[in-house]
Amino acid sequence: MAAAALRRFWSRRRAEAGDAVVAKPGVWARLGSWARALLRDYAEACRDASAEARARPGRAAVYVGLLGGAAACFTLAPSEGAFEEALLEASGTLLLLAPATRNRESEAFVQRLLWLRGRGRLRYVNLGLCSLVYEAPFDAQASLYQARCRYLQPRWTDFPGRVLDVGFVGRWWVLGAWMRDCDINDDEFLHLPAHLRVVGPQQLHSETNERLFDEKYKPVVLTDDQVDQALWEEQVLQKEKKDRLALSQAHSLVQAEAPR
């Protein structure tokens, strides 16, 4: 009787275990359930965001604008090749200028960048929204102890002083600022009085000068009165010239006959 009870208990446990094995879902079923739950959560989040945007359109527009601006900045962040092109273009621009007309500060900044570039001490880093070019103490391939020891590396507190240029929305702003007046040499105006060394915006007449320069090549159009006046003046000048010639001839004849 005890043996029969044990057999019944054992058979019942095996049946329950078999039902549990059959009822347990597989890997793909669990992945499908997880994907459906994830999509359901995202759908609810999108519905909530849409409802919030309809309730507060101003805030939604600000968020969309910020996201769009961040995406544009991320896309337009200049690359290392863009900095190389800008540096070579700036160097070529200075070479086309006469040494006496080059801005000393612009030339010194570009020469420093070229010097660091030639020694492999320029570093480029992309921060997503913008790019940075900074100065390194050694070449990346240098094997010196000072270059490899991590205890001798520059401090992060000194990093702002080593930044050379900032790239944002497709431009390198520091290099562009130095090259803005690259063809103006302030040393040329040191001999001038103090009030003539600085020119204000109201004192510039470049547009007027350019217009007058172009007008000097245009044909002169004269009216009939101006033509008559010019002809009369020409006749008067010719008459005066003839009179002076006659007087000079008479004077020479008088001087020739005087000794006789």
UniProtKB/Swiss-Prot annotation:
Main location: mitochondrion
Membrane-topology annotation of the record: Single-pass membrane protein
Record's keyword annotation contains DNA-binding: no
The keyword Phosphoprotein is assigned to this record: no
Location in the cell: Mitochondrion inner membrane
A Pfam cross-reference name: Tim29
Segments passing through the bilayer: 60-77
Mitochondrial intermembrane side: 78-260
GO biological process: protein insertion into mitochondrial inner membrane
Cited function: Component of the TIM22 complex, a complex that mediates the import and insertion of multi-pass transmembrane proteins into the mitochondrial inner membrane. The TIM22 complex forms a twin-pore translocase that uses the membrane potential as the external driving force. Required for the stability of the TIM22 complex and functions in the assembly of the TIMM22 protein into the TIM22 complex. May facilitate cooperation between TIM22 and TOM complexes by interacting with TOMM40.
Subunit record text: Component of the TIM22 complex, which core is composed of TIMM22, associated with TIMM10 (TIMM10A and/or TIMM10B), TIMM9, AGK and TIMM29. Interacts with TIMM10B; the interaction is direct. Interacts with TOMM40; linking the TIM22 complex to the TOM complex. Interacts with TIMM22 (when oxidized); the interaction is direct.
Official protein name in the record: Mitochondrial import inner membrane translocase subunit Tim29
Originating species: Homo sapiens
